[in-house]
Design a protein with these regions (language model features):
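Secreted/periplasmic carbohydrate-active enzymes, especially glycoside hydrolases
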Residues: 1-90
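A six-helix transmembrane bundle that forms the core substrate pathway of small-molecule transporters
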Residues: 89, 115-116
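Substrate-binding/catalytic cleft of secreted carbohydrate-active enzymes
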Residues: 93-110, 117-261
Length: 261
């Protein structure tokens, strides 16, 4: 990747240096071209466009690297090296994780690895009272201000699977997730204010009002971006080969642990 050394110097009226900051910067454009729905009859779209070119994404999710987060940084470079060896060009910072150390983003910048960044919420419906919303606002503001400078950052996503969490409860699949205040109002307004250059996705998978109305309930099968957790017996099972998602941001198989573990 092409990074540049940039120095910002602030002088007082006498020409004396007040403060100075040096950073590595990258120059690029990024947009997310997506539709609100996808069907067999009307296939949708979900594609990242970097410097006016569509990118075929080959990526992975990034989860907590250690049960003790104080040791996370020691694991970052070996895992990034593995991503490079696998020819990954995107890492999705999964919403059940923690906001990663600056070293992670620096390595992604240096190696041209795009970062899809969930805000750190996932898999449930969160409180909506004013006290909780203020805590989310404070946390998100700190995260955006710290991470927004990295050219590897290509997306903020409101959460992991909060939109589809209602689908897992028998009494909640008809609760419209598009009314949820954190992902629909609070976070997008903060991204527009603090990092307007970076696209925002309310949830992953995102159930738009159009997708909700089309299905009449929460159903990610009408969303162009999906998480595919199905049968593990065969990777070419119809569950995978006949799926109409335009972008699969989460999928997995059971892995064999190392003997040492």
């Amino acid at each position: 990747s092409s990074l540049y050394n940039a120095t910002l110097t602030i002088l007082d009226k006498e020409g004396e240096v007040v403060t100075e900051d040096e950073q590595k910067i990258g120059i690029r454009t990024v947009t997310l071209d997506r539709t609100d729905t996808t069907t067999k009859e009307e296939p949708g779209e979900f594609v990242f466009i970097v410097n006016h070119e569509k990118i075929f994404v080959k990526g992975t999710n990034w989860v907590a690297l250690d049960a003790l987060h104080s040791r996370d940084q020691a694991h970052i470079k070996p895992n990034i090296d593995m991503m490079i060896d696998l020819n990954c060009n995107m890492i999705r910072m999964w919403g059940g994780n923690v906001y990663e150390h600056d070293y992670f983003y620096d390595l992604c910048d240096a190696h041209g690895i795009m970062v899809w960044h969930d805000f750190m919420m996932g898999c449930t419906q969160y409180p909506q009272d004013d006290i909780f919303l203020k805590k989310i606002e404070d946390e998100a503001a700190k995260a955006i201000a710290r991470i927004r400078k990295h050219p590897s950052l290509v997306l903020w996503a409101g959460n992991n699977e909060n939109d589809i969490a209602g689908e897992w409860n028998e009494d909640q699949p008809y609760v419209d997730p598009t009314k949820e205040p954190i992902s629909r109002y609070l976070l997008p307004s903060m991204v527009r204010r603090l990092d307007p250059k970076t696209p925002y996705l309310p949830s992953s998978p995102y159930i738009s009002s159009e997708a909700f109305n089309l299905a009449g309930r929460i159903d990610q099968n009408f969303a162009p971006e999906q998480h595919l957790w199905g049968p593990r017996g065969y990777y070419k099972a119809p569950f995978y080969t006949e799926n109409i998602a335009k972008f699969v941001s989460e999928i997995g198989y059971h892995g064999c642990p190392s003997r040492e573990s």
